[in-house]
Amino acid sequence: DYSSQSPWEAKKEFPRLFDNLCGTYETVTVIANSIGAFFAMSALADSKIEKAYFISPVVDMERLIRNMMQWANVTEDDLQKQKEIPTSFGETLSWAYLCYVREHPVTWTVPTHILYGEKDNLTSYETIAEFADRIGATLTVMENGEHWFHTKEQMDFLSDWIKQCT
């Protein structure tokens, strides 16, 4: 488990965790989902990772933040002036976060397998497909899958997917 709430915190925390947990192993596989995958890509891009399995990864945080701004009817000027704006859907929009992801784009070269739910409400298919193509990742789409894999059917699909990828 990790405690980071932002990519700049993950950039400090994740390499220490990685070195402590994985430093003696010859090969390491990372399995992460959603924002954990984004944090891993942001913080561990230079680490010795053999492969990665990402479930519903956030692959374009700037786009996600801009989408959330639209959902909350918040302009970039509003966010810049107010610095942080709580939303009705439980997220707090942050100017610092938006600036950070713009200034620190993800560069990920680890061989990666991605599982994506067809009904993911945070990342569009176009976004995930473009990312997978750009980094040479395999992309598996679960029909009727959601962002959060949690039902028995989704968890069985996830388990079968990992077995097929190995």
Regions found by a protein language model. Name each.
Residues 1-22:
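Catalytic nucleophile-loop/oxyanion-hole region of alpha/beta-hydrolase
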Residues 1-3, 37-38, 60, 148:
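Short secondary-structure capping/turn micro-motifs that flank functional sites
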Residues 14, 40, 128:
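Aromatic/hydrophobic pocket-lining residues that form π-stacking "cages" and hydrophobic walls in ligand
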Residues 18-30, 110-111:
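Mobile, glycine- and charge-enriched loop segments
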Residues 23, 47-48:
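Short helix-capping segments at alpha-helix termini
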Residues 31-40:
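Gly/Ala-rich beta-loop-alpha elbow adjacent to hydrolase catalytic centers
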Residues 43-44:
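Aromatic pocket-lining residues of Rossmann-like dinucleotide-binding sites
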Residues 48-130, 134-165:
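The alpha/beta-hydrolase serine catalytic core
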